[in-house]
Amino acid sequence: MLRVFIFFVFLGSGLTGRIKPQITCKYFISENNTWYKYNVTILNGTIVLPAYNTIPSNAAGISCTCHDIDYLQKNNISIHYNTSILKTFQDIRIIRCGMKNISEIAGGFGKELKFLDLRYNDLQVIEYNILRKLIRSNTPTYLYYNNLMCGKRNCPLYYFLLKQEQTYLKLLPQFFLRRINFSNNNTYLYHFLSCGNKPGHEFLEYQTKYCRTKFPEINITVNQLTAKKNTERYKSCYPLVFISILCSCISFLFLFICLLRSICKKYSCTKQGKSGHNYIPLIPSYTFSLKKHRHPETAVVEDHTTSANSPIVYIPTTEEKKVSCSRRK
């Protein structure tokens, strides 16, 4: 019996050594709030996440976990990410798949992203603008249990976090710090994996001082980060600001024209009232004279509005004729 037991033990160990590691992937359907498993294939030594032609079009999320990343690395199996499909997801969870840079999938972050989980990867660099975008959109993001570098490439991130520590320092455990439980006193310490056991504030002060001393060529200062943040914040409001300024200019011009017209009218009226000249009507006035004419039919009308004073024959009415005749009698 002992020999049979030893035989089955060796057989089981041999079989487990030959079993290829599995990559468990699921897609999420929001209509029924359910996750569904699907198989991932290795094609030409490459795994594509999410896989082509395996996820329905109405999927709202993806969750993939690599159970044995060491096997993938030893067998030169690489993982590529399909960012065009990731843009349609609200929930992205890629765990323990050896991701070294968040920018590998940052192009797939759409506006609909509501949850991001990249724990237990090998993230070494995190661009501060990507982290700021995730924070500003209030997206729950889990980046801890990674391997963030203490070197030059993360200096802008340290500057950004130190400046915004009052707001973002509380979120550090959620994003990329790991938690260690000391069983002796049940205390927790948050620190970067490869940057020593320093608390968040002390670590940021140490790292920013280190960056400014060792890498002075990095010209991204705290003030520049803040200015860039404010510029990006109000960048979407520029068209509205331009329209409001244009409307205010038009209204000001209209008021100015109205005020100018009222002043001109008032000035012209006062000037006319002070002058001794009589008001000259627009209709030409005619002076009728009956100079030395016996008959009113030959009366001459003198036009004072013209320089030629050309005579115009005036034909009197019947009543005027009667008045003229009565005067003669």
Swiss-Prot record:
Entry keyword NAD: no
Record's bilayer topology term: Single-pass type I membrane protein
Residues exposed to the Extracellular side: 17-239
Family indicated by similarity: Belongs to the asfivirus I329L family.
Record text about domains: Contains putative leucine-rich repeats (LRR) and a C-terminus cysteine-rich capping motif similar to domain structure of host TLR3.
Keyword annotations from UniProtKB, A to Z: Disulfide bond, Glycoprotein, Host endoplasmic reticulum, Host Golgi apparatus, Host membrane, Host-virus interaction, Inhibition of host innate immune response by virus, Inhibition of host TLR pathway by virus, Late protein, Leucine-rich repeat, Membrane, Signal, Transmembrane, Transmembrane helix, Viral immunoevasion
Lineage of the organism: Viruses, Varidnaviria, Bamfordvirae, Nucleocytoviricota, Pokkesviricetes
Name of the protein this chain belongs to: Transmembrane protein I329L
Transmembrane feature ranges: 240-260
Subcellular location: Host endoplasmic reticulum membrane; Host Golgi apparatus membrane
One GO BP annotation of this record: symbiont-mediated suppression of host innate immune response
Induction (UniProt): Expressed in the late phase of the viral replicative cycle.
Function comment: Viral TLR3 homolog that probably prevents TLR3 dimerization and subsequent induction of IFN. Inhibits dsRNA-stimulated activation of NF-kB and IRF3.
Cytoplasmic side: 261-329
One GO cellular component, as annotated: host cell endoplasmic reticulum membrane
Post-translational modification: Highly glycosylated.
InterPro entries, per database record: LRR_dom_sf
Glycosylated residues in this chain: 32, 39, 44, 76, 82, 101, 181, 185, 219
Signal peptide start and end residues: 1-16
Superkingdom of origin: Viruses
Organism: African swine fever virus (isolate Tick/South Africa/Pretoriuskop Pr4/1996) (ASFV)
Disulfide cross-links: 195-237
Chain positions of LRR repeats: 112-133
Gene3D superfamilies assigned: Ribonuclease Inhibitor
Presence of the UniProt keyword Disulfide bond in the record: yes
